[in-house]
């Protein structure tokens, strides 16, 4: 890395800083993204307020652990460093760690959170401060919005797939099921074709590694249409219902494991012809 060149350029970069430059920065970090990703919120607290703004880039190679994505977030609150770190870890776990494009990864990722302290609100020094809970909730909302933007702009994506796994024995097994479905090439290509292929969904659940899984207890809903139960196609289900359920750009799959109280949600996209083209043509 040319440290001397970077250091020499810092003064000019600092002089060029301006509050309205977030969109420029969002565009500057793009790689195979087709559009910049920027999210912001302002939260009113009594007579004062605080804001959180973030940008991110990433359209493939997102999981695990953010893979090749970059995210830069800032707030004008003043927050103790340890509390800021704890809030970021929690928010990332429920957002950037809940998405996947292709299940592939790389060694280059970063997510930073900066607190400038320019808000007129008092500094947060304790996790028991009610303002801290408000901040954590707002931060999670901004990061989840950015995470979903990445999925919607996934390489070649034509569909946004929300996978809700409920009734698991633990959150981890819910995640195992959700990500096995989300990263199945057969599921993702069926999604691209708007094919309500319940067999591929059940097959993915079956190989997710759950101990003593009773397939007869599993239920599948696509956009609220019951498509499978007791290990087979639901008696009330028709192919016409499935086609209608799969037609929208946004598709929600609800998986009922019925073996506990845990649940989680994961977001992914489909595999299209363009996904193959983009990655066949891309050169690093």
Predicted segment positions?
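A structural signal for small-residue-enriched, beta-sheet-centric alpha/beta enzyme cores
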Residues: 1-284
């Amino acid at each position: 890395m040319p440290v001397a060149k970077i250091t020499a350029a810092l003064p000019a970069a600092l002089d060029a800083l301006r509050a309205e430059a977030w969109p420029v920065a969002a565009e500057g970090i793009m790689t195979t993204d087709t559009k910049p990703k920027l999210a912001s919120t302002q939260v009113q607290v009594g007579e004062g307020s605080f804001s959180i703004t973030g940008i991110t880039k990433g359209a493939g190679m997102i999981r695990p652990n953010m893979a090749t994505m970059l995210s830069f977030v800032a707030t004008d609150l003043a927050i103790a460093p340890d509390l800021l770190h704890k809030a970021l870890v929690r928010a990332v776990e429920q957002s950037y760690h809940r998405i996947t494009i292709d299940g592939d990864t790389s060694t280059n990722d970063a997510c930073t959170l900066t607190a400038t302290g320019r808000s007129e609100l008092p500094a947060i020094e304790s996790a028991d401060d009610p303002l801290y809970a408000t901040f954590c909730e707002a931060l999670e909302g901004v990061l989840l919005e950015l995470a979903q933007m990445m999925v919607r702009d996934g390489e070649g994506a034509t569909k946004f797939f929300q996978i809700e796994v409920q009734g698991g024995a633990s959150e981890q097994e819910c995640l195992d099921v959700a990500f096995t479905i989300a990263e199945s090439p057969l599921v993702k290509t069926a999604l691209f074709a708007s094919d309500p292929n319940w067999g591929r969904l059940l097959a993915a659940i079956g190989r997710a590694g759950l101990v003593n899984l009773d397939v007869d207890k599993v239920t599948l809903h696509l956009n609220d249409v019951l498509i499978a139960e007791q290990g087979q196609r639901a008696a009330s289900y028709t192919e016409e219902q499935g086609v209608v359920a799969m037609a929208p750009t946004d598709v929600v799959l609800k998986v009922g494991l019925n073996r506990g109280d845990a649940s989680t949600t994961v977001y992914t996209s489909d595999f299209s012809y363009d996904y193959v083209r983009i990655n066949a043509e891309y050169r690093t």
